[in-house]
């Protein structure tokens, strides 16, 4: 009999539903038991965040900075600038639209009530270093490896990255549904889960519309550069979009993205280089989601969300997206460090960010891979071999 496999998104959705359902009748002692698990898991996650940054950013900087040519540098720069643009577009739209949706939502006191479910005990696992130190260390080490070309250090960094990715895949992601279950169990027990969910649904609808607008803008730029119809170019990329909706993986969608990019007239040399590279470093859709979710949660809790703070957050987030691992939920795991260090998100805010992000993981990935086709068109305009 064929084994039924549930992906991360279905498990997260089931965890949310069960958390709300069981929270209506489970006794406080059981809720405290899950609060104990959440406390330990959260401390473990906070311990891992600097290691995730070092493990992912260091080899990424070493590879991008190794001087493989102008094509690599320009592709990486365009991918980064597009990611930053997506974050700024998301912030401005969220600031204009979300206040109308979040009015009457959960207040600061309501959000804080979930923290009143105290664990039986907790285990302190302090991080080895803070997030900013880890980020600066990663840049210094990565650039140093690129400059000196040390194969031994690169091999060590690559193996450490494998350890980090394996930890995310085997320890963090499998336990996330239980963690999310505990969060919504506590929120239901304290009576404010429904108001949070109501806001969640409204936010998801707006973010979906935003990512469609972002794709249109990306292909309008590509169309202007190549002097071609942007909507026809975007239409050609739709098979890649719908494939990514099903796989939630940029890497798994590469064959389809590459095929549709070639159908758009991009040369085989440029497409073969840019599509696999952008599948790793171009996460405009993921950035759009993370910024919007962060703005929404900060509005819900009356936290300041001024433009200066968010600009710094978006610039750092763009770097973290370059280094994000290619696993479901990898982008939000890579972003936890800057969410905490720049925006001041605590354990509960980070848990809600994870839940909200993963419920939209598939169309964020679809936005990422479809946008790769737009970047390939621009790169091809200037780097196609003339015959």
Where are these predicted regions, by residue range?
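Signature of multi-pass transmembrane helix bundles
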Residues: 2-26, 39-48, 70-232
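Transmembrane alpha-helical segments and their short flanking loops
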Residues: 102, 291-387
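Short amphipathic alpha-helical coupling elements at transmembrane boundaries
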Residues: 35-46, 155-170, 235-243, 259-263, ...
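Membrane-water interface of transmembrane alpha-helices in multipass transporters/channels
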Residues: 33, 69, 73, 193-201, ...
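Alpha-helical membrane segments and immediately flanking helix-loop junctions
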Residues: 111, 234-291, 318-332, 359-378
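Alpha-helical transmembrane segments of polytopic integral membrane proteins
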Residues: 19, 50-58, 86, 90, ...
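Membrane-interface alpha-helices at helix entry/exit sites of multi-pass transporters
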Residues: 69-75, 170-173, 263-279, 305-308, ...
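Transmembrane helix-bundle signature of multi-pass membrane transporters/permeases
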Residues: 40, 44, 57-58, 75-80, ...
């Amino acid at each position: 009999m064929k084994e039924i496999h549930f992906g991360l998104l279905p498990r997260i959705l089931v965890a949310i539903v069960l958390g709300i359902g069981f929270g209506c009748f489970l006794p406080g002692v059981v809720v405290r038991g899950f609060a104990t698990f959440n406390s330990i898991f959260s401390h473990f996650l906070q311990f891992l965040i600097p290691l995730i940054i070092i493990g992912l950013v260091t080899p990424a900087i070493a590879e991008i900075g190794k001087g493989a040519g102008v094509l690599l540098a320009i592709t990486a720069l365009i991918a980064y600038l597009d990611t930053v643009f997506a974050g700024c577009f998301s912030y401005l739209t969220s600031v204009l639209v979300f206040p109308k949706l979040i009015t009457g939502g959960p207040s600061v006191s309501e959000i804080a009530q979930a923290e009143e479910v105290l664990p039986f005990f907790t285990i302190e696992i302090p991080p080895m270093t803070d997030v900013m130190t880890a980020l600066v260390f990663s840049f210094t080490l990565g650039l140093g490896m690129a400059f000196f070309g040390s194969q031994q250090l690169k091999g060590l960094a690559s193996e450490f990255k494998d350890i980090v990715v394996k930890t995310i895949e085997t320890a963090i992601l499998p336990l996330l549904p239980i963690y999310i279950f505990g969060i919504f169990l506590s929120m239901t027990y304290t009576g404010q889960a429904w108001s949070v969910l109501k806001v969640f649904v409204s936010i998801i609808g707006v973010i979906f519309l935003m990512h469609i607008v972002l794709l249109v803008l990306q292909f309008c730029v590509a169309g202007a550069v190549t002097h071609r119809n942007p909507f026809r170019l975007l239409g050609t990329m739709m098979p890649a979009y719908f494939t990514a909706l099903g796989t939630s993986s940029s890497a798994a969608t590469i064959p389809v993205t590459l095929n549709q990019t070639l159908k758009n007239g991009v040369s085989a040399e440029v497409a073969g280089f840019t599509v696999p590279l952008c599948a790793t470093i171009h996460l405009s859709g993921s950035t759009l989601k993370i910024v919007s979710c962060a703005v929404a949660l900060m509005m819900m809790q009356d936290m300041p969300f001024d433009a200066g703070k968010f600009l710094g957050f978006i610039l750092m987030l763009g770097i973290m997206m370059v280094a994000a691992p290619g696993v479901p939920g990898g982008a939000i795991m890579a972003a936890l460090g800057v969410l905490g260090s720049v925006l001041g998100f605590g354990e509960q805010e980070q848990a809600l960010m994870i839940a909200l992000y993963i419920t939209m993981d598939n169309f964020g990935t679809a936005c990422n891979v479809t946008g790769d086709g737009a970047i390939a068109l621009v790169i091809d305009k200037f780097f196609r071999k003339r015959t």
